[in-house]
A protein has these predicted regions:
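Short, surface-exposed basic-aromatic patches at helix termini and helix-loop junctions that form
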Residues: 3-17, 167-176
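Intrinsically disordered, low-complexity regions enriched in small/polar residues
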Residues: 8, 12, 23-25, 38-44
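Conserved beta-strand -> loop -> alpha-helix junction used to position metal-binding or nucleic-acid-contacting
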Residues: 12-32
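Long, contiguous domain-sized segments
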Residues: 20, 30-63, 67-338
Length: 338
């Protein structure tokens, strides 16, 4: 919808050499950037899912590491405690009465730490699961960025990691000479605890820009916005795609009867939900209707109103942050794919 609205507002930018809708998501970024952004990998795939009702089977499926689950369970169940023997040596003692962990065990903080320990011990095997996905994404973005030295990647937010991971892959994994500038709707807020400053350094050096608010811009909005109250999800719903969230990039061999035996990139999206897609279309039809009214303004009127501040935009959506409205809108989300 951002691409559609931008092209309506600036028809001269409508060509594919100027703007293009591209596939990317925090799920894809987390997998593809795991080698360098290990902390983010475990935070998103493990620690954010603690005590949320996810089973170990679901967690490993989400990471696309299902074949490593059995080995991890064996490692967890065979884990033992260490005791001091009294003469300075350490001896291993099996924990008495310990209940065996199964694939249907719910993820807790204790189990998450043990899974992280196991995956770190087998880190190269983890990365090898995403090797072909990194190659496939490189094929895709190699075509998208061909002939470009500097591009802006527009994203909702919030830590700005999407553009950061993409920049790392472009330079260090795929060897492309292109600079990425992240354009965010909003950054992490004061309610993000230790991660509230994530985007600030990048903004300071001009690698990211935030429209709605930041620590130095509309600070009252920065203090109001709270992911724990669903505020992130409201914005993501407004700007989400009707075709489903990106699951990842995959290499696929072309059939011999389809023009050759080459390898090409297959883009996989989340499960298409007609109900959610219909709601998204309705919401975004309103956005496009507004753009049509905007473009109908006379040049003089348009010049007066050309700057719509981030505060004004947030004020309209803030109504949806009311508890009753928020609960109704949350029923529409594909939280797993966002």
């Amino acid at each position: 919808i951002l691409c559609k609205a931008y092209r309506k507002m600036y028809p001269e930018e409508a060509g594919s050499d100027r703007t293009e809708y591209v596939y990317w998501s925090r799920l894809a970024a987390t997998k593809l950037g795991a080698e360098y952004f290990k902390y983010d990998y475990f935070r998103r795939f493990l620690h954010h899912k603690v005590n949320q009702g996810y089973t170990l089977k679901q967690v490993f499926k989400g990471m696309e590491l299902s074949d490593m689950l059995a080995g991890c369970i064996v490692a967890i169940n065979s884990e033992s405690d260490e005791e001091d023997s009294g003469n300075g040596d350490r001896v291993r003692k099996m924990t008495a009465g310990k209940t065996s962990v199964t694939e249907n065990e719910k993820l807790t903080s204790t189990i998450a730490e043990k899974i992280e320990k196991y995956l770190k011990k087998n880190w190269m095997e983890v990365l090898n699961h995403y090797r072909d996905q990194r190659k496939a994404a490189g094929e895709y973005y190699g075509r998208v960025l061909q002939g470009h030295k500097k591009v802006a990647a527009a994203d909702v937010g919030w830590a700005g990691s999407g553009a950061v991971v993409l920049q790392y892959l472009i330079r260090h994994e795929w060897g492309l000479d292109c600079e990425i500038i992240g354009l965010l709707a909003g950054t992490n807020s004061i309610h993000n605890g230790m991660e509230k400053d994530t985007a600030e350094g990048l903004r300071a050096v001009g690698k990211q820009a935030s429209y709605l608010y930041s620590q130095e811009h509309n600070r009252d909005v920065w203090k109001f916005h709270n992911a724990a109250k669903g505020h992130n999800l409201l914005w993501e719903l407004l700007l989400s795609s009707e075709e489903g969230s990106l699951r990842g990039f995959y290499l696929k061999r072309m059939e011999s009867g389809a023009g050759g035996n080459g390898i090409f990139c297959e883009i996989r999206l989340g499960v298409f939900d007609e109900k959610h897609a219909g709601v998204t279309v309705e919401i975004q039809r309103g956005i496009l209707d507004f753009m049509q009214l905007w473009n109908a303004l006379t040049p003089g009127d348009r010049a007066e109103a050309v700057e719509i501040s981030g505060r004004d935009v947030y004020a309209a959506v803030r109504i949806c942050c009311d508890e009753a409205n928020r609960q109704e809108m949350e029923k529409l989300f594909d939280k797993e794919g966002i």
